[in-house]
Amino acid sequence: MAIVITVLAYFCVLLLFSHLTARKMASNETFYRANRRSPWYMVAFGMVGASISGITFVSVPGMVMRTDMTYLQMCIGFILGYFLVAFLLLPIYYRYNLTTIYGYLQQRLGERSYKTGASFFLLSKMTGAAVRFFVVCILLQRFVLDGIGVPFWVTVPVMVLLIWLYTRKGGIKTLVWTDTFQTLCMFAALILIICQVMSALGMTPSEAITAIANDSHSRIFVFDDWMSKQNFWKQFLSGVFVVIVMTGLDQDMMQKNLTCKSLREAQKDVCSYGFAFVPANLLFLSLGVLLVMLAQKQGVALPDVPDDLLPMFAASGVMGNLVVVLFTIGIVAASFSSADSALTAITTSLCVDILGRKEDMKLRKRMHLLVAFVFMLFIIAFKAINSTSVIDAIYILCSYTYGPLLGLFAFSLLTKRQVNGRWSPWVCIASPLICFAIDTLTSQYVGYKFGYELLMLNGALTFAGLALIKKETVKYKQ
């Protein structure tokens, strides 16, 4: 009962934020860009939480079981990636005064390339966000809600409805403030869980830091094995490209950054939260090491699936009801701060990029409701499929859609050529399919399994395809 009361109180606070930020008549400009009046430090803090999904909240502590703390190598790459986004991409987005970042493709490559880029974003974001939210719903159902008799078919509609309720008026303006609150809740829950684990281990903070540093799972850097996926340079470069593509070329991740008052403030915002990812993920990984120590101390067998490490202790009640409540708040805060911005970004892209009716408020309201409804249907469909392998395949295939976005933007930025718009959608469809075939064949016949480097190959194939198709004689718009 305490969990239900806590979560309801949490949602009441979100609805209060929504009411306060949308008291005056909220226009489409407010919904899409918050009238470009957002304080950069609020955006920066909220973006840390928005970038950490509920899956991340659960998965990162479990990573130490198999790969120690080597994930921090990728987080170091994130820093360079965010600097590149801040000083290469943001100036372009602000120069063109864009509502959605895909408007740049319209300026540079024409209408069809513009629609293609936006369509790939919509496909990837809707499916990817639904899969992530589905996994979080399953975790909450399995470890918390089943125990108090709440069925899955009630959980999903209620959670999606609540997201729609607090975003329907203020949109991105509301999210700047709610994401700040949710990030605060997430880190408060994380730190309090760490304190509870230290208490169970009988350690002071300084003793815990020493124990973590001396533990075999505290390994961060891998320089000596070039074949390992955890090799520093592979992880570092992957971190750079992941940020450029999955943040810099993603309307969901960039929309709040475009609400800052000026380019300079937006750059401060992006660089600030770029640095924050190293200490943030260090906390998650440190929790993972402490949980492994606790399992050894209590003689508890570690789970076969690393993602179950935190839920095994935090949601099972082994460490008390307080930790269960904290775990619930943490995972809800992390998942909501990701899902709410995804639904807002999808609505924005649909109205502005696909339908071309930026000023139509009635359409925007209908599209926002429709997006929430389709999002709910996707989650229920994943539950009906009830096959981990099928859902994983869907998620992997949708992740391939970021490659064409990388290729489209790289071609636009690095060349002054125009393309034959008739063929650009086919190039963007062919590149992920070729990558999927290459990945399957190399895995089957060579034994090599691509990681994040497949994203770079995908982008390179798209770039090459765009270079091959017939140029149009349209003057490049400076």
Describe these PLM feature segments.
Residues 38-47, 108-117, 182-195, 275, ...:
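Small-residue-rich segments of transmembrane alpha-helices in multi-pass membrane proteins
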Residues 16-24, 126-133, 137-154, 165-168, ...:
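Hydrophobic alpha-helical segments and their helix-loop junctions in multi-pass secondary transporters
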